[in-house]
Structure formats: C-alpha cells, structure tokens
Amino acid sequence: MNQNNKHRTLLFRAALAAIAIAAAIFFWYQLKTPQQSSPSDQSSGLRHSPLPPVQVATAKEQAVPRFLAGLGTIQAANTATVTSRVEGQLIALHFQEGQQIKQGDLLAEIDPRPFQVQLAQAKGQLAKDEAILANARQDLNRYQKLANTHLISQQEMDNQRALVRQHEASLKVDQAAIDSAKLQLTYSRITAPISGKVGLKQIDVGNFISSGNSSSIVVITQTDPVDVLFSLPENDINAVLQAQKTNHDVVVSAWDRNNQQQLAAGKLLSIDNQIDATTGTIKLKARFSNQESILFPNQFVNVRIKVDTLENAVVIPNAALQMGNEGNFVWMLGKENKVSKHLVTVKLQDTKRVVISAGLAAGDKVVTDGIDRLTDGAKVDIVTPMVNKPQPQKHDQTENS
C-alpha cells in the first residue's frame, strides 16, 4: 500500500514537471516570434498614432471672379396677343400649337367675301363720280364759250366751276373708300406680328370673331432671345455701374433652382431708373440666347452677375475657415507638424472656397479636417484622405437614376 502511494506521488510530480517545461517552452517561443498586424490593419493602411490626425490643404494664389447673386424670373423678350382688326367668320387657322413661326407668317383667315363686296362698291362709286365729273367739265367748257357772247351770267359760270371742283373732291373720297376696302380685305388675312413660339389657340374655326382685344386668336412669345428680370440690393449698384464702365458687356449667368447647374450665360441689358423703397432693391434686366429652348417665360432662376476679378487672390478651402470669439481664423501647419491659430480677414466666400485678404500667404498649409481636437502648439499627424473607387454596379445605378 505504501509502495503504491509512493508510486502515485512520483507520477504526479513528473506530470507537474512536464507541464512546467511545456509552459516554459511556449512562452519562450512567443517571445522569440515577432507579432504581425491583423489583416484588417494591413488592408486599411491605418497608422495608430497618439497624435491627432488631420488633413491639410495649401493656400493657393489665383484669379477669382467676383459675383453678385440674386433671384430672377425669365421673361419673353417680346409677347404679342394676336387679335383680328376686322369682324367676320373665322374660316382657317394656319399654325400648330407650340410651333415656331416667323414675322409675317399667315396665322388665320376671316371670310373675305364681305370685304370684297365693299371694295367692289367703292370702285363702282368711283366710276359713277368720274362720269359725273366728266359731264360737269363738258358743261363748264360750254359755259365758257357762251360767256364770250354774254349769253350766260357770271354767276352761272362761277356755279359751274364750283360744281366741277365738288365732283373732283368726290373722286378723292371715292379713292379713299377704295383704299379702305382694300385694307379691310388685307386684314382678313391675319399674319404674325413678331417671330416666336405660338401658344394654345384661343378660338376655333367657324366662330364669329370681333375686332379689338375682346377676342384673341393666339399668343406669341419670343423665346430666343429671352430676358431675365432680377433684383439686387441697393448697396451693390455701385459695383454694377463700375463693371459697366470697365467692361461694357457685363456677364450674367442663370442657374437652376438648386444653384448647382448653369443654364445659360448672357449680358446685362439695362438697369431700372429707381430703387424700390419698400424692399431696398433695384431691378436689372439681362438678355440670354435660348436657341435650345431650355428657358421658359415665368421660370425662376438664380442669377449671378460678374462685377470684377480679384487678381493674385489667396484662396483656401471653405472647410479650413473657422469662427471664434476673436473673429475668423484658421489652423496653420508649421514646423515639426505643429499647428497654430491664425486670425484671417475674409474678402469673399462661397460654398467651396474662401478668399483671404490678410493673415495668410500663398503656400501656407491650413488644416481642413480634424480641427475639433486641436490646441495651439499641438503636434499633429498628417493623413491623406482615402478615396474609394465607386463600384461598377453603384455607378450604373447612379446613372440610371
């Protein structure tokens, strides 16, 4: 029994010794084997650094155009409401709704027969009065012969001369009636007063149409070119006037409602002669070519008018500009990758870039991302933004959408 206990004790001690030796070998192997980074770290390329990571951009010197912005409305350069100048039955329409027409094109016809009858009557009256005048002149010639023999009085002679002049005047009245009848007959053929695009017809063939503005046939709008009417604050008028003096053709561009896509470019046409006392703005008009018919009357657009160009301007991304209690500032990257706060003066700013007039020079580096963790004099870790290539399937979906 004692021998069995001793044997078990020896086996237990031998097992413990083997475990201890195996553990020692394992830890020794771990210490000698270098650690490898995880696959995710290798694929992403991220660097684990105790320094705050930032992205930077370099201030650039470039020419920057200066624009004034406003909200405008497209207007047709000319609009004409086509009406009839004579009364009658409409017998024909010679246009299609939405058609582009030219000045002088035939649009509609009114029954011409009543006007042809009036013309014939006027011509008949002229022929009648011509015959009466011829007879009066013959009588006058006879009276003149008899006057030499004193067979008629001077009073009768004067009356005959007056009668001839009266009939001569009647011929002029008759000729005027003929001209009027011809004009009325011409008005029965209604032509386009301007070139442009016709709208929807306002009357159908077969209806009786009256003269004047009471019954219109169609409205024509001149859509090429078109005008844009917009307003600017009265404080901007001096910049516009100066731009007109420097460059007579002031460039104006029209943008879509989201202010993302330029629709057309044109030139400033005119400036109103007074400021609206209620709004403190002044109206301006620009003219645009519209050959592709992408601008429609009464369409709202964003307007940008170029007033000048800032040469050698210092430009930084809009993300670099910060606002503090002391004013506008940027985080500038200095030596040893240390950042410092610099106050700057802003000249111009839009959604993408900022023009700095003081506080920065071309070539200075400013922080654009990671700004919230910065302190003055802190050392930073500059990282490059990762650009993910779009997958083909997503790209196709974007194009289809």
Curated annotation (Swiss-Prot):
Subunit comment: Part of a tripartite efflux system composed of MdtA, MdtB and MdtC.
Subcellular location: Cell inner membrane
Record-linked Pfam families: HlyD_D23
UniProt entry tagged with the keyword Cell inner membrane: yes
Main location: membrane
Record-linked InterPro entries: CusB_D23, Multidrug-R_MdtA, RND_pump_MFP
Similarity section: Belongs to the membrane fusion protein (MFP) (TC 8.A.1) family.
GO (cellular component) term, any one: plasma membrane
GO BP annotations listed: response to toxic substance
Record's bilayer topology term: Peripheral membrane protein
Keywords: Cell inner membrane, Cell membrane, Membrane, Signal, Transport
GO molecular function: efflux transmembrane transporter activity
Coiled-coil positions: none
Protein name: Multidrug resistance protein MdtA
Signal sequence residues: 1-20
